[in-house]
Amino acid sequence: MMMMMMKKMQHQRQQQEDHANEANYARGTRPPISGEGPTSQPNSSKQTVLSWQAAIDAARQAKAAQTMSTSAPPPVGSLSQRKRQQYAKSKKQGNSSNSRPARALFCLSLNNPIRRACISIVEWKPFDIFILLAIFANCVALAIYIPFPEDDSNSTNHNLEKVEYAFLIIFTVETFLKIIAYGLLLHPNAYVRNGWNLLDFVIVIVGLFSVILEQLTKETEGGNHSSGKSGGFDVKALRAFRVLRPLRLVSGVPSLQVVLNSIIKAMVPLLHIALLVLFVIIIYAIIGLELFIGKMHKTCFFADSDIVAEEDPAPCAFSGNGRQCAVNGTECRSGWVGPNGGITNFDNFAFAMLTVFQCITMEGWTDVLYWMNDAMGFELPWVYFVSLVIFGSFFVLNLVLGVLSGEFSKEREKAKARGDFQKLRENEQLEEDLKGYLDWITQAEDIDPENEEEGGEEGKRNTSMPTSETESVNTENVSGEGETQGSCGSLCQAISKSKLSRRWRRWNRFNRRRCRAAVKSVTFYWLVIVLVFLNTLTISSEHYNQPDWLTQIQDIANKVLLALFTCEMLVKMYSLGLQAYFVSLFNRFDCFVVCGGITETILVELELMSPLGVSVFRCVRLLRIFKVTRHWTSLSNLVASLLNSMKSIASLLLLLFLFIIIFSLLGMQLFGGKFNFDETQTKRSTFDNFPQALLTVFQILTGEDWNAVMYDGIMAYGGPSSSGMIVCIYFIILFICGNYILLNVFLAIAVDNLADAESLNTAQKEEAEEKERKKIARKESLENKKNNKPEVNQIANSDNKVTIDDYQEETEDKDPYPPCDVPVGEEEEEEEEEPEVPAGPRPRRISELNMKEKIVPIPEGSAFFILSKTNPIRVGCHKLINHHIFTNLILVFIMLSSAALAAEDPIRSHSFRNTILGYFDYAFTAIFTVEILLKMTTFGAFLHKGAFCRNYFNLLDMLVVGVSLVSFGIQSSAISVVKILRVLRVLRPLRAINRAKGLKHVVQCVFVAIRTIGNIMIVTTLLQFMFACIGVQLFKGKFYRCTDEAKSNPEECRGLFILYKDGDVDSPVVRERIWQNSDFNFDNVLSAMMALFTVSTFEGWPALLYKAIDSNGENAGPVYNHRVEISIFFIIYIIIVAFFMMNIFVGFVIVTFQEQGEKEYKNCELDKNQRQCVEYALKARPLRRYIPKNPYQYKFWYVVNSSPFEYMMFVLIMLNTLCLAMQHYEQSKMFNDAMDILNMVFTGVFTVEMVLKVIAFKPKGYFSDAWNTFDSLIVIGSIIDVALSEADPTESESLPLPTATPGNSEESNRISITFFRLFRVMRLVKLLSRGEGIRTLLWTFIKSFQALPYVALLIAMLFFIYAVIGMQMFGKVAMRDNNQINRNNNFQTFPQAVLLLFRCATGEAWQEIMLACLPGKLCDPDSDYNPGEEYTCGSNFAIVYFISFYMLCAFLIINLFVAVIMDNFDYLTRDWSILGPHHLDEFKRIWSEYDPEAKGRIKHLDVVTLLRRIQPPLGFGKLCPHRVACKRLVAMNMPLNSDGTVMFNATLFALVRTALKIKTEGNLEQANEELRAVIKKIWKKTSMKLLDQVVPPAGGQCGLCFLSPSRSRS
């Protein structure tokens, strides 16, 4: 009994400790080990309790045990038993033999009976389970609670309050037991020292505290009610703490901890980024304050009254280009609250920050932009908002993703390594045990020899059986026949010996073999695929209002197919045997689907169940489509990697679920029953009960319209003017944690696993190639044996060679990214030793690109059968084409013709402008035609190699020019054809691709990416399709509704009805009743797929979800909250497709781009980091430090360079920022004056700073630093600003102007003044030069911008092409205020079209714009339509246009950004002990102190002190002793000049080389030669002088010269 108790205690203790270790490990602290008893190692002070340490200890113990066991061999069993116990013990106890403190709470020793009881209870397994169940039950209780408006309640809630006490008691008891068992605080493994325990502790204490408070307030309430209310609110706030209890579940699930740990670890780099984001927000908020303060409060009022003139008011402007009040008798004046109930504005710093944050999240930013356009005119606002979205969203927020994916893969590798080690240990253990058993068995065999013979016979009989090519035979033989023989009695044996049964067995065996061969054949596979395809067809042909015959056919087909699938299953079972059949996951799944189908059919036939319920089962059959993957390796690898990531995703989903639950419960506490402030409309996204709260939180998590929910929350607490603004914190935290952190972990997991899948693919390819090679070799050797004639042999070999070469030549054309050492065989036209622009998103700086192309020779063969290679005409053409002026001219013409396309007027096609542009068009077309003819004359048309038409890019040119020519030919005959051809002219800019090399590489890279993405496209489309089919089953015909909500079927929905505007009985409006379908519906598979696509882009999905929830019957109106459970369909779809598949899509693009970038350096022996560091070391130049000789100047210089001066300026900038942020709308005159004076003071101070610096550094030295130039610009701008505001006193009072409308001059003059006021804000940017981490971030930012020019060009081209097509197709749609195509958002001019596309790229309600461009829309009154054709504008092409644009943008283009960023910012998560380019700046800075003149050399004696000042990994650090530093320096082999100096680049290069171990092993001279070759290969332009400096050639001087001086010094 005692033994069992001990064991149990050990087990529980191990568990507790594991948790403690895990948590401590997560926080990065290592619990020290208390006195470890006799087993502890002498160096226990240094030991770290990581789980592998425990394992190593165990290994040592096992070794010791082994040595014992060898000395005493006989009792093997007992020994292995003891060993196993020992191992288990050591494993359980971690490292410390007694983790519990000797005393708990200063009084209870380990032998104290109370404490022993506590320990045994706490470490008892059922106790753990009980607590987990209690937590779970508590969550359920919290969820059942229904919040009511005005703090009402019902009996359930009262009962729940009582249950709450029970939970509180349970948790309190648990806490006290644990505290007694482990001690409270002072010991290493004490209770509160574990993070999870601390959380428990706080929750319990707060719970107790709230109960006590409640009792106290109840007692005081007896006296008077008013005092109790406030106490009640406090309790409510404390009650909200209970919602954290679900977090305790985390400590029970280890895989959750990996995800959580990686998120927690990522917090440090994330903080850097958070600072950067905050910085961007602050700068933009202050600029917004300066530009837009008080602009949102003017709107159109009726003259002489305070009644707003419009239904949905918008800001307006007195004059200028803003919105004018159109209705007569209305005027523009201030006095309106502002949009969104006055929440969205720039009236003071807090509101401005909230508005800017909302714009960065890309929800509702266009609304703010449009309001600003209305208030100020459209010249200025777009610059502000578009730059904010590009910087804030695309760049800075994508950094979050980079950091998370880096951390996640690191954390996963750690966990994996830990797991592998554990497995290794266990295997060793097993082997030892096995050895023990083998000893036993050999002994036993010696005793019992008779059995052996029988076994032999049995074996013989088995081997005679022929085995098939598959392993399953053997398993099945054993399982099938072995069992029957074993189970039969003597009777069975008698029967089995008879002839008949033997025949039957033989026949059975033969049949099964035949069946198996059939099942495994490719024909059978294709048959099944055809059946699956037919099955898919029947299911997808279902739609709303289908004719009866179709329904019958579908029923019959379903039954027939079901029968066939059942047959297939049975045949497989028979041929493979049950055991082998169920090994494959696919077969299990198949079986499940078939059984489901059979049950469904039976239930429907017996009319036990409506067909709808189970028809979803039918759709699950569609999963069979994935059978295709069996013979398609890359696809099956992809599916495999998806299934692999399911594990990590499951734990992430659990975490996500916990997160959603906690925030839903919190939301119910805060907003339950509060969203009833507007009686006229029912809000759908509320927190009134648990399911609804879950949906709302999930909606905020996807980021769709989260700002609308936030506005409701603020209004519920009294609107923007009250303290209600505080609640926005809840929404912001929820949005940041959920959308940015948790959802990006999805992406991180995706990227991580995809990289694995890719490596799997390549490995398989290599294996296949290897097999192929062996096959060929075998064939050859056979042939050689056949005919032993040596001549034949030689011929065969040489023949082989030729074919291989030919093959290579052919393939060279196809492979756009050859490795480093193979010349590009892209096309005869550009032959080059190496692509100068690396493929992938990191092209080198344009300055480095060698844009000179080698001139391509005239190809062999005659052009047009008449012009030979030497024909003078042809030679002349060749010269002309290759002349640089000609190529540049053509580029210019391409640009001009593109500009002409953009300048066309889409509405009035016969306007003067269009006529002029038409003439230009003729000219451009003529020029391009001549160019093509010249090229064809030179290269020939297409019959021979290298001809003009053999290059895809040339074909593109031909197409574009041909289209233009054709459209001139048929000017009037068929209008629509011409229209299409005119649209095709848009492809002109694409011709530039062929002219700019860098662009060409990016484009090729995109194509490669698209090729590789193919597989994922297939999987995603299949999933889309499946969900669409299920959606059709669930919702077909159910999304109809009447415009009058009182009527619920088409028969009643006729005539007119009266609507009261805003619930006001005095303002009735008459409307017509119309029975209409939803724009997005599930009536057939295609519309279902479109609806689901919009859901997967997260745009407008809540509206669709609530339509689905309200859906009632086919062709019947909605019923409020009719089936809430339907929302599960949408949530599963969003999680599988939108979160997971779309992220994998994105991840795939990123992985592909990174691989393409690396491909170029495939054979260059240096990895990316080494390349970057070496490049830096080769290109860096020493910094000049100016130290003045003049003593007075030196004093100035000394002051300016001192730290106190720096800090003073820092503080001043902060104060200046504070002053700027204090401005607000309607500020008093006094405040205004104070602000102006402060502004002058600051301007004065910064001017003084500039003057001091100019004196100290002299103008030349001052302006050589970029930051100083920036400073001086700001100072000059500020001075102009002060001067202007003094000269024009009206400006300084930023009170709104009187309602009189001053002239336009006033307006423009004001804009110029506000422009100069921006200089005040720009001082903030100076802060960036101060922080170290931020500086590195900025440096990387600039670096990634250099990688972006071609990507940006590609994006610009995409936008250009789509904008021009949009103008041609949708330019005539009329602008209406209540429509998506309106004054702010339309295709009527080129800039407007580009802005609209930019809006779609950020995903702002793109699907609504698409609907507004469909056919049947009203035409613009100015456009040329015939009478009766008012409603003919728009086109069905809109669907293709918008969906293709959205996909290109969201998945390809924006991911180019992400790929570039993740590439450049990997240093944020990399191990800081590995040298990276960001460490090398420090070397330059410190070198300049020893070499102020930037001569590039210092005395060798200074090198040691220099390196001891630089921190590792680059230098030695201050802690490195002098002698060690000297020794390490000698080992570096740094070249030393004859005058005893060392060179800058040589020193830096040697440091990089030793830190990254680049070619440091082996023979030194040989390594140097190899390294020289690599450098020459990658950096062709490195001068030989520099190369000899950094890597001395063989026989040159070497770093051993360091020996003598260092000896003399030491």
Curated annotation (Swiss-Prot):
In terms of Pfam families, this protein maps to: Ca_chan_IQ, GPHH, Ion_trans
Q: Name one GO cellular component term.
A: voltage-gated calcium channel complex
Q: Where are the IV repeats?
A: 1190-1465
- Which region ranges are annotated with the description Phenylalkylamine binding? 1430-1473
* List of residues binding Ca(2+): E363, E704, E1099
Q: Which SUPFAM superfamilies match?
A: Voltage-gated potassium channels
Which residue intervals are annotated with compositional bias (Basic and acidic residues) in the record?
Answer: 765-789
Region annotated Dihydropyridine binding, chain positions: 1073-1163, 1418-1484
Q: Where are the I repeats?
A: 112-408
Provide the primary localization: membrane
- The keyword Repeat appears for this protein: yes
Compartments, as annotated in UniProt: Membrane
Report the InterPro entries cross-referenced here.
GPHH_dom, Ion_trans_dom, LVDCC_a1dsu, VDCC_a1su_IQ, VDCC_alpha-1_subunit, VDCC_L_a1su, VDCCAlpha1, Volt_channel_dom_sf
Q: Where is the composition biased (Low complexity)?
A: 53-66
**TM segments?**
126-144, 163-182, 195-213, 235-253, 273-292, 381-405, 523-542, 558-576, 585-603, 614-632, 652-672, 727-751, 885-903, 920-939, 952-970, 977-996, 1016-1035, 1126-1146, 1204-1222, 1238-1257, 1265-1286, 1312-1331, 1351-1370, 1438-1462
Q: Where is the composition biased (Basic residues)?
A: 81-92
Q: What segments bear the compositional bias annotation Acidic residues?
A: 824-836
Give me the stretches of Polar residues compositional bias: 37-51, 462-487, 790-801
**What membrane topology term does the record carry?**
Multi-pass membrane protein
Extracellular membrane side: 145-162, 214-234, 293-380, 543-557, 604-613, 673-726, 904-919, 971-976, 1036-1125, 1223-1237, 1287-1311, 1371-1437
III repeats by residue range: 871-1153
Q: Name one GO molecular function term.
A: high voltage-gated calcium channel activity
Q: What's the entry's take on its domains?
A: Each of the four internal repeats contains five hydrophobic transmembrane segments (S1, S2, S3, S5, S6) and one positively charged transmembrane segment (S4). S4 segments probably represent the voltage-sensor and are characterized by a series of positively charged amino acids at every third position.
Q: Its function?
A: Voltage-sensitive calcium channels (VSCC) mediate the entry of calcium ions into excitable cells and are also involved in a variety of calcium-dependent processes, including muscle contraction, hormone or neurotransmitter release, gene expression, cell motility, cell division and cell death. The isoform alpha-1D gives rise to L-type calcium currents. Long-lasting (L-type) calcium channels belong to the 'high-voltage activated' (HVA) group. They are blocked by dihydropyridines (DHP), phenylalkylamines, and by benzothiazepines.
Tell me the protein family, please: Belongs to the calcium channel alpha-1 subunit (TC 1.A.1.11) family. CACNA1D subfamily.
Q: What's the protein name?
A: Voltage-dependent L-type calcium channel subunit alpha-1D
Q: Which organism is it from?
A: Mesocricetus auratus
- Give the classification, highest ranks: Eukaryota, Metazoa, Chordata, Craniata, Vertebrata
Q: Which gene encodes it?
A: CACNA1D
